[in-house]
Amino acid sequence: KVDKSLDSLNKEIDHFVQHVKDTKKNMLNAGHEISWNYEKKFLPKSFIEKQIIRVNDNVALLNHRDVLRLFGYTKGHYQRAVWRIDKFHEMVWFPKLYSNSDWVNRYDQETNTILQFRKDLKPHPIPPKDEHDRIVFAHQKNIFGQTVYKFYGIFTADHVKTDSVRHYFKRINTTIDLTKYF
């Protein structure tokens, strides 16, 4: 391990700060809007106003109710793992993408699939072929330790890989146009 001198470290930091400033300047010159407000980041209204959400936008909200507001929900807190939007043959799914008391849900970045199975490996009903598409907002902790629900995209059951124990869901879209829900 090589320790850096304080002067060397300061130069490295200055270089990185200049890189960030240059990147921001280039983005502004290209017409991109750059604004960041920590509180606004978690408001459903911010995303509804944008009208479209994308996986690459790192969309995360603080609770089920706030996520469901994106889809026209107007009631109080909601705690279930799934909320159906029958009008559009969709559902919002809130999987925990880590092992928990009863279920294991894993997201594979290489294949853009979610694997779901019971911890006891008991069979559970295979999703029907006409099941609603799943708009996935996964339960996770952000870098500040807050529980958030992060948008992973729209998924559908992969009936080729799914069996009665292991269910696979493949991502079919990384973008949602929210205007259809209002």
Where are these regions (language model features)?
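Compact mixed alphabeta submodule
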Residues: F144-F182
